[in-house]
Amino acid sequence: MEDLNEANFSHLLINLSNNKDIDMQYTSTLSVVHELLSAINFKIFNINKKSKKNSKSIEQQHPVVHHAASTGREFNRR
């Protein structure tokens, strides 16, 4: 299944919930779904922000050292 563009999906939910030709209970359900998705996205955004902040802090405390010979491969030199 293709990923839905978040902004387009949100726009669709808003438009459907504002549609006067649709049953009131259905529009209320769509509004609740929209609010729940917004709350979930906000929580995910905050978790990602904290994660990035923590990873930067850890990298500053323990810098990663890359060794060229640490790949475990031997090169055939002829």
Curated annotation (Swiss-Prot):
Superkingdom of source: Viruses
Pfam families named in the record: Chordopox_A30L
Region (Disordered): 53-78
InterPro entries: Chordopox_A30L
Post-translational modification: Phosphorylated by viral OPG054 kinase.
Keywords, comma-separated and alphabetical: Phosphoprotein
Function statement: Required for the association between the dense viroplasm and the viral membranes to form the mature virion (MV).
Family: Belongs to the orthopoxvirus OPG157 family.
Assembly behavior: Interacts with protein OPG092; the interaction stabilizes both proteins. Interacts with protein OPG062.
Protein name: Protein OPG157
Gene: OPG157
